[in-house]
């Protein structure tokens, strides 16, 4: 299974409050055998906080996590698909890019905590991360 990880998942896992970190890491462990996929946009969004505060330990934690993922580029075809998704749904720009990247790079599902994907009628599975509840596929 190829599983695209939304930025919020990594931020919860590595930079969230302790209870969010623990619950998110438990849920990620459930998908330990999956091929975790992130895009350059995920990398950028995750690094902003640690760069802003010059927190080298957090930077190292994120970069270490990235090394366990397949990092996919955002080709023009991905951006074109993101524009189509943005035009057809209520997704914000970054969310449309995440979904387009996941679809373009053959992911089976996208793991997120963002409710907006529920309304987008995504062409792939959407797994909602809920730190206080077990994950479940969205239909």
Features from the language model and the residues they span:
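Short active-site oxyanion
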Residues: 1, 32-36, 68-70, 104-109
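Short, well-structured N-terminal submotif of metal-dependent ribonuclease cores
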Residues: 1-38, 50-61, 127-139
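Acidic, PIN/NYN-like endoribonuclease modules and their adjacent C-terminal/linker elements
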Residues: 1-2, 99-139
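A generic structural signal for short hydrophobic patches within well-formed alpha-helices
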Residues: 10, 43, 79, 117-118, ...
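Active-site neighborhoods of divalent-metal-dependent phosphate/nucleic-acid chemistry enzymes
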Residues: 70-115, 119
């Amino acid at each position: 299974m190829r599983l695209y990880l939304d930025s919020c998942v990594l931020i919860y896992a590595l930079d969230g409050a302790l209870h969010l970190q623990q619950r998110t890491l438990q849920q990620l462990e459930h998908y330990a055998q999956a091929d975790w996929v992130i895009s350059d946009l995920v990398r950028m969004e995750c690094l902003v906080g640690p760069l802003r505060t010059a927190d080298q330990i957090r930077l190292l934690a994120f970069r270490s996590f990235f090394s366990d993922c397949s990092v996919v580029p955002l080709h023009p075809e991905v951006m074109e698909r993101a524009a189509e998704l943005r035009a057809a749904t209520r997704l914000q720009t970054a969310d449309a890019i995440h979904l387009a990247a996941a679809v373009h790079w053959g992911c089976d599902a996208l793991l997120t905590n963002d409710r907006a994907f529920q309304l987008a009628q995504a062409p792939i599975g959407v797994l909602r991360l809920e730190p206080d509840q077990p994950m479940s596929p969205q239909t």
